[in-house]
Amino acid sequence: MRLSRYFLPVLKENPAEAQIVSHRLMLRAGMIKQAQAGIYSWLPLGFKVLRKLENIVHEEQIRAGHIPMLMPTLQSADLWRESGRYDDYGQEMLRITDRHGRDMLFGPTNEELITDIFRGHVSSYKDLPLTLYHIQWKFRDEIRPRFGVMRGREFLMKDGYNFDLTKEDALHAYNRHLVSYIRTYERMGLQAIPMRADSGPIGGDDTHEFLVLAETGESEVFYDSKVTDIRLGEREIDYDSVDQCRAVMEEFTSLYARTDETHDEAVFNQIPEERRRSARGIEVGQIFYFGTKYSEPMGATVQGPDGKPVPVHMGSHGIGVSRLIGAIIEASHDDKGIIWPEGVTPFHCGIVNLKQGDGEADAACDQLYAALSAIGLEPLYDDRNERAGGKFATMDLIGLPWRITVGPRGLKNGVVELTSRKTGESVELSPEEAVKKVADIYAPHHPHLSREEPMAGRSFHTWL
């Protein structure tokens, strides 16, 4: 993309309404614009990151054997009355009456709707286990929306629901989701710690929240410092293996890590003092096992092996996709702007032309742009007639991990400058070497990269 043709309304000054870093930088970088309190328009740069996160979530869900679908934002109030939860959400639920006088609501979650779908189409234990999920916009009427997309009223969320014949099968689904979520967050450059938590109005017997440590987090958390040393990395996990999923679950949850709602001071004090930590955390996901809490009152049963009807065991699993962007920025920024992890950056590399209009510099930038595009990367070429300082400031603000700087002086020596946004370190390379270096950096994140042929055309959702 050429910046002269892109819509990137960056702000030079810090917006007065922004209280935390992620909100301030998302507004300044032209990622979002507030439509009303807690509701945002996603501008091209922000939407591009949102789409990348969504695709990572889809890829990891499908890898775990989960099936994508899509449910509506508007739901019937009757389903919520049937489950007994219609009044539990209080004023956070946006209630609507249509022209026929039917009570409806803008869904804050989807347990009732998915249970209704299940009971209408699944009747035998032979159709289990089953895990369905979707990514959809939600609405919760927060009394004080703040912190930008971190605590908005409208947000994009992944909901997954498993249906199993037995508690043991449902707990395997719980562990499978935990593994899948950890891998998802690691691909996004985040360390999200699973912590024992409270189930809230969703209910259930077992639940873990995934929290990213950050000073601006809304939750107080208590943990053993050794928990931050654990990584899943490139380990291959068989999601059908009960033992493998349980082993990962135990590895990541055996050390003390809890939110303030479930914190046990006596147990915490048994940890060696030098390893005890308390901090703030941003919740980016949660998994639940709630047994037959919804299936029994709503009649979601299957015919068991003995021919008798039995209520299915269920679980619910959510990732706050739009909130993740705020969490990533809170965890990865400096005083100049955002520093995107390579797995989620909106563009893979920036190209800065120090002397727009110079024939040699223009040609070199065009060649770099074409070469990077041909191997499947997305460069952002700043071809505006702006001062070099302004171009560098824009690149630093929007946080692309790598920048190639092209100028007449370097080209006389046959080199361009490749700069890391994270470290600020620069190296002079030939244009061909710079392209190869960037391609090598992104190869682990993009196995489809080609050194010879352009990337094939892609659909809007790469998971389709």
Curated annotation (Swiss-Prot):
Function per UniProt: Catalyzes the attachment of proline to tRNA(Pro) in a two-step reaction: proline is first activated by ATP to form Pro-AMP and then transferred to the acceptor end of tRNA(Pro).
CDD domains with a match to the protein in the record: ProRS_anticodon_short (cd00861), ProRS_core_prok (cd00779)
This enzyme's EC code(s): 6.1.1.15
Keyword Nucleotide-binding: yes
An example molecular function term from Gene Ontology annotations: ATP binding
Xref: InterPro entries: aa-tRNA-synt_IIb, aa-tRNA-synth_II, aa-tRNA-synth_II/BPL/LPL, Anticodon-bd, Anticodon-bd_dom_sf, Pro-tRNA-ligase_IIa, Pro-tRNA-synth_IIa_bac-type, Pro-tRNA_synthetase
Location(s) in or outside the cell: Cytoplasm
Protein name according to UniProt: Proline--tRNA ligase
Catalytic activity: tRNA(Pro) + L-proline + ATP = L-prolyl-tRNA(Pro) + AMP + diphosphate
Subunit structure, as described in the record: Homodimer.
Record-level GO BP terms: prolyl-tRNA aminoacylation
Gene name of this polypeptide: proS
Swiss-Prot/TrEMBL keywords: Aminoacyl-tRNA synthetase, ATP-binding, Cytoplasm, Ligase, Nucleotide-binding, Protein biosynthesis
Main location: cytoplasm
Keyword flag Aminoacyl-tRNA synthetase: yes
GO annotations of cellular component type: cytosol
Cited Pfam families: HGTP_anticodon, tRNA-synt_2b
Family that this chain belongs to: Belongs to the class-II aminoacyl-tRNA synthetase family. ProS type 2 subfamily.
Organism from which the protein derives: Ruegeria pomeroyi (strain ATCC 700808 / DSM 15171 / DSS-3)
Gene3D superfamilies tied to this protein: Anticodon-binding domain, Bira Bifunctional Protein, Domain 2
Highest taxon above the source species: Bacteria
